[in-house]
């Protein structure tokens, strides 16, 4: 998996591209932080997860995975992550005025990767820009 940092309104969202499944996975805690503005997004996610399991009878294992993503301290740590479908389910459980702009941002992230699959030259350009620090 290729780990990347994506930016939504200046906030970092840790992500990973699974080339076998050809889909993005995003750190759920990062998304919760962006949507809620919570000082403790890990605890907020714990409560949402508990509510989803109890009230909605959701099997989180069907759309949540533990992935090693780079933590703020620079170390690779396991964190809950979900693909786009899972993220949309989670967004529905979090009341936030940022939900709609975030959904549009997710769609753009997905479109960028599809464009790169269709035109591999875009991947090379993106890697060049990234290595040049632009």
Regions found by a protein language model. Give the residues of each.
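An anion-engaging/catalytic patch
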Residues: 1-134
């Amino acid at each position: 998996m290729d780990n990347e940092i994506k930016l939504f309104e200046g906030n970092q969202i840790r992500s990973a591209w699974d080339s076998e499944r050809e889909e993005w996975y995003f750190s759920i805690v990062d998304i919760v932080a962006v949507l809620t503005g919570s000082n403790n997004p890990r605890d907020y996610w714990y409560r949402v997860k508990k509510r989803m399991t109890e009230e909605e009878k959701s099997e989180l294992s069907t759309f949540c995975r533990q992935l090693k993503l780079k933590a703020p301290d620079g170390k690779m740590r396991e964190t809950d992550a979900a693909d786009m479908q899972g993220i949309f389910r989670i967004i529905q459980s979090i009341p936030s005025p940022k939900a709609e702009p975030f959904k549009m941002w997710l769609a753009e992230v997905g479109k960028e990767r599809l464009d790169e699959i269709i035109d591999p030259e875009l991947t090379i350009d993106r890697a060049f820009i990234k290595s040049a620090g632009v």
